[in-house]
């Protein structure tokens, strides 16, 4: 059965969130991802973020989800999806694709505090080629839509992250030094025709610049998917960054001279101003 275009209305989502909120250890539930931000496609999954204590009752969670699907559901244990995406389940509910994504509420609070201090890091995580951005947890609560939040945890955290923290904005802009460092390394690979290495360095450099453009606009990033093209949709002048990045990354070349030319184009990609500019 096709799930393209199948959606669940707000009443259904809130009913599901209430079911989840009754499970011991679940503190809050929110609609997340592209549907919370209003940037979804017709075939986008429905992401439900569950903010849980470490001792959440996974068996009870599975039973609640089984009540919607009519079949057995397995909830991955902590770390089952990797150290940062953590755990959850993929479901089909009333014909719609639903992702249950568990977030340890203590870790989320910690990352909100780090974001406020201007600290961030990328971590190795399956499915995240750039790495999982730890303060994406803060971005999720800032952009999510609370569906069940009896203690006001999500509302309080979102307020603490709104507007975008100045310290975090400055940290991402200052991190642009890595772009030239990466491209200098790519130059060495280009001389030997190592297209894969050049492409990896170039893509990483473009994504770091794209992150900086988003923070310059005060916009949270929670996933590197769509990161580069979405710069063109920011409410600030980004000087054609997205189109320029797509052009060079789409034809980076294979011969040394082609790779070196692509690196030169990557160096010239528009960047947001740094404090020293």
Indicate residue ranges for each PLM-predicted region.
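Catalytic metal-binding acidic patch
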Residues: 33-68, 87-103
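Conserved NTP/Mg2+-binding pocket subregion across the NTase superfamily
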Residues: 2-5, 69-190
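Conserved nucleotidyltransferase catalytic core and NTase-mimicking acidic/glycine-rich helix/loop elements
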Residues: 146-277
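Hydrophobic, Leu/Ile/Phe/Ala-enriched alpha-helical segments that form helix-helix packing faces
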Residues: 20, 65-73, 270
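Helical scaffold of the NTase/Pol beta-like nucleotidyltransferase catalytic core
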Residues: 1-31
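Short N-terminal helix-initiation segments at or just after the protein's N-terminus
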Residues: 30-44, 143-152
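Short low-complexity stretches enriched in small and charged residues
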Residues: 1-11, 47-60, 161-167
